[in-house]
């Protein structure tokens, strides 16, 4: 089974221009989980949150995530200033589901095994998890030619070291688009970056 770990940086409100969703797909999640545990213990933390880390701490974690070349990193960033239909931003769950479909497409389309998708439970309303699962399954089975099982679940990030790792990655990507800080972003090995809306992003 292939597992997709999802976390985001920013929000879908009007405060900041960009919103980022990052996806980590590890070949060996145990390696990442182990060094995340060590990092938490060494720094006296209860949970890793990208916004609360120092730059050296973020550098350390990003280096560890990349070091074995066994984790695929992808992301989608949305330019909220160029969303033409305001309804998409009024219903944040619909917008979130829509963005995730672009982020998941290539991974699910080329997978030859069951897929598990795990999100932070602070991301969407609990009652919306079923609508997300149904939406992704419809896309996968009717448009992407996927023939295996898909499970969508959510957990509190404090219980998932992989979600915490995704948070650090999302934070580094967010800093690039919001603050123009490329230092951490350039240390990431990005498999796929999606800028939405496609033709007018950043204009």
Regions found by a protein language model. Name each.
Residues 1-203:
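Phosphate-ester processing/binding pockets and catalytic centers
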């Amino acid at each position: 089974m292939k597992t997709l770990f999802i976390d985001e940086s920013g929000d879908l409100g009007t405060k900041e221009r960009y919103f980022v969703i990052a996806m980590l797909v590890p070949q060996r999640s145990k390696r990442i989980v182990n060094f995340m545990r060590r990092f938490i213990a060494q720094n006296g933390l209860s949970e890793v949150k990208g916004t609360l880390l120092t730059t050296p701490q973020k550098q350390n974690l990003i280096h560890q995530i990349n070091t074995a070349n066994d984790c695929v990193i992808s992301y989608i960033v949305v330019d909220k200033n160029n969303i033409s239909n305001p309804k998409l931003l009024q219903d944040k769950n619909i917008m979130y589901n829509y963005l995730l479909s672009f982020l998941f497409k290539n991974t699910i389309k080329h997978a030859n095994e069951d897929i598990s998708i795990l999100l932070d439970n602070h991301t969407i309303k609990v009652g919306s998890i079923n609508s997300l699962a149904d939406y992704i399954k419809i896309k996968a089975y009717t448009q992407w030619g996927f023939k295996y099982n898909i499970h969508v679940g959510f957990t509190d990030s404090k219980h998932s070291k992989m979600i915490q790792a995704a948070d650090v990655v999302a934070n580094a990507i967010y800093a690039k688009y919001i603050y123009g800080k490329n230092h951490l972003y350039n240390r990431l090995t990005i498999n796929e970056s999606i800028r939405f809306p496609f033709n007018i992003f950043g204009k």
